[in-house]
Amino acid sequence: MQERTEAFSARSLTASLLRLPVWAQATVVYAVSRVVTLLLFSIVLRFQAPTFWSDDKPPTFFEFLGFWDADWYRRIADEGYPRVLPLTDSGDVAQNQWAFYPLHPTIVGWLRDMTGIDYKVLSPIVSHIFALAAAIAILYLFRRHADPARALAGTALVFFFPAAAVFSTGYSEATGIFFLALSLLCVDSRRYLLAIPAVLLMDLARPIGVAFSFFMLIHLLDRIRRRQTEPYPLLEVLASWALGVLSCFFAVLQPLGAWMLTGQFDAYRKTEAAWTGHTEVFTQWLTASTRYLGWWGPIALAVLILLFVWGTLGPTGELIGRTQKQFLFGYAVYLLLFFTPQTSTLRLLLPMFGLAMVQARSRSRTALASALIGFTVLQLLWISLLWRLVPPTGFPP
């Protein structure tokens, strides 16, 4: 009897939630996820030692949310970008602001100047606002290819994902994910011209532009291939190719800006190399897999790639939608070519939010609840093991 009552209550709650407007559904799910995340941050804060980010004193809550790369964004708001690249004692380019994109710190800096509120307070607030907008955009995108209940479940999985804790910090992930979701929504609905400003702002927020350009190439070739079954009128041809070309240009705005301001053509590349000590193409994945798993490493890497392809193209990926599948492959190619596996890997997977629909395909409430509980536990580990700094130094999450 008790089990029936609990099941009835769960169904009633779900039905009530699904009767709300779409934006309200996303807001409720997002709000619950942020309450959980902020609670986890407050728990871990109790164990955070004083750091240089908090002037060698126990950090306040907002200072804690401003650790790691969030401090680089603050420096952009305070100092701008360097015109002369800083150098290490060995003569290599040192870590500097050029590795971080300007949109988030610019918005927060403007608000700080207008209101007088401290940057460290405003930055996570701005992140929360953009993350809410992202939740709404993602839910609308998911609903284009899945029923309302499973689309909402997928949205919940996105915002309970372990690295989604970063949406509550001074990082620019929330800003980038919002404009990415908006761009994909525009492309999926064939509103290519509306996607242009969204892609521009996305590329000013996060380095997603190269991956988006790969995606647009896949998308455009697919539109040509399928033009017999899906009409591809001249206006859509012109608009879609305009978006594709502009996507390539927007993707290099940050490197171009670094070149123009410093006078050094490879300023951006050398700045990126300051974090890893090198820049490689694809071989960095083989190197990392071998380092951690020995000769099993490349085999494990191949298995992961095959699982990704099967999960996306197989029956489990039926709710992802063609546009999101194309972006997932474009982004996966980008990661394999240019990204070096490190402590930031989970965070770099956030743009692949479409994969949440693989798990959301199940109609089992038990499976969904188990996934959300598991993600919550992993989020606590992400905050305590990666976000919390054990002085004197560490690696960014």
Describe the predicted segments one by one:
Residues 36-49, 213-318, 322-328:
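Membrane-lumen/periplasm interface segments of specific transmembrane helices
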Residues 53-60, 65-93:
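Extracytosolic helix-loop segments that constitute the early lumenal/periplasmic catalytic or substrate-binding loops
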Residues 92-98, 102, 106, 114-133, ...:
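Loop-to-helix entry region of an early transmembrane alpha helix in multi-pass inner-membrane enzymes
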Residues 109-110, 122-145, 309-314:
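Transmembrane-helix motifs of polytopic, lipid-linked glycan transferases
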Residues 118-121, 139-160, 178, 326-328:
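Transmembrane-helix signature of polytopic, membrane-embedded enzymes
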Residues 146-148, 183-194, 363:
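Membrane-interface transmembrane helices that cradle and orient dolichyl/undecaprenyl
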Residues 169-175, 345:
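Short acidic/glycine- and proline-prone juxtamembrane loop motifs at membrane-interface regions
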Residues 180-185, 193-220, 246-250, 333-334:
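Membrane-interface alpha helices of multi-pass inner-membrane proteins
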